[in-house]
Amino acid sequence: MRRVDNGAVKHDAGERINELAEQVLTQVDGLLGRHHIVPNAVQTQMLTSHVRSMAHRSITGEPLPEVDASLFDEISAESMALAREIVAAFGNLPDEEAWLLSVHFEVAKDNL
């Protein structure tokens, strides 16, 4: 939905969220391809949903619930680095987002 205000076209938050999510999902696809990580259909669906939620939090400023860092001690440095690269693309999300996102990469790496 677009709204016109004094002649300027404004996108509503939902449209901005979708645009950001699609942009970042394109980056995720490229990143996965470069690292030869191939998620299965269910993993892809869950990853897509997570990235869309991240886009929502990025646009709305909605915070994550508190996350216990120790839950991610067994995540590989590679998966964490990939997740941090994606989180950096948003430009305004906390590092805890990378902790959560890294799980998707870690699980998908096991498909090889």
Task: Please state what every model-predicted region is.
Residues M1-L112:
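A cross-family "folded-core" feature that marks the main globular domain of proteins
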